[in-house]
A protein has these predicted regions:
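C-terminal binding/interaction regions
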Residues: 1-24, 29, 53, 79-145
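Short beta-strand elements
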Residues: 33, 38-48
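Short, thiol/selenol-centered motifs that function as redox-active sites or metal-ligating centers
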Residues: 36, 59-67
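Short, glycine/acidic-enriched capping/hinge loops at junctions between secondary-structure elements
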Residues: 41-43, 55, 68
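Immediate flanking context of iron-sulfur cluster ligation sites
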Residues: 50-59
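Catalytic-loop motifs flanking and including active-site residues across diverse enzymes
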Residues: 64-68, 107-110
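Alpha-helical support elements that line or immediately flank enzyme active sites
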Residues: 68-79
Length: 145
C-alpha cells in the first residue's frame, strides 16, 4: 500500500495540480521553510459566499512539500475560510498516506501553513512540530479582519 502512496506523491511532485498563480486573487500569501529551502506562494479566489472557488500555488520544494500542497489544493473547493482554518495537520497526513518523519513534517505542512495564512491575511500561528495553532483562535482571528 505504501508503494501506491509513494507513486501518488511522485506523480503530484512531477505534475502538481493547481500549479501557477491566479490573476486578481482575493487571498494571497507566501512563505518558506528555511531549513530545507522549500518556498510556496498561494493565490485563492473566493466566490460570492466567501468560499474557495479557485486556488493555485507555485514555488519550489521537495517532493513531500509539493505533493502535499498539490493534494491539499484538490480538496479545498467549496470550503469557507473558517473551514480552511480548522483543517488539522492530520488531514494532510491522510492525503499523503505515508508516515512522515519529524524532520520532514515542516515540509509536509508548508502548504497548509501558507493556505491558512492566506485565509487569515497574516502569518498563521505555527508550532515547531508543524501543527497549526488553536483552530478556535484562528477562527476568532478571522473575525477581526
Amino acid at each position: 500500500m505504501d508503494e501506491l502512496y509513494r507513486d501518488q506523491i511522485l506523480e503530484h511532485y512531477k505534475r502538481p495540480h493547481n500549479f501557477g498563480r491566479l490573476e486578481d486573487p482575493d487571498l494571497e500569501f507566501e512563505d518558506n521553510n528555511p531549513l530545507c529551502g522549500d518556498e510556496q506562494h498561494v493565490t485563492i479566489r473566493l466566490d460570492d459566499d466567501g468560499r474557495v472557488e479557485e486556488i493555485a500555488f507555485d514555488g519550489k520544494g521537495c517532493a513531500i512539500s509539493t505533493a502535499a500542497t498539490s493534494l491539499l489544493t484538490d480538496e479545498l473547493a467549496g470550503l469557507s475560510r473558517e473551514e480552511v482554518l480548522r483543517l488539522p495537520k492530520e488531514f494532510v497526513l491522510e492525503l499523503l498516506g505515508i508516515d512522515i518523519s519529524a524532520t520532514r513534517m515542516k515540509c509536509a505542512m508548508l502548504g497548509l501553513k501558507v493556505i491558512k495564512s492566506a485565509s487569515l491575511g497574516q502569518p498563521a500561528e505555527w508550532e515547531d512540530e508543524g501543527e497549526a495553532g488553536d483552530p478556535a483562535q484562528a477562527g476568532a482571528d478571522l473575525e477581526t479582519l
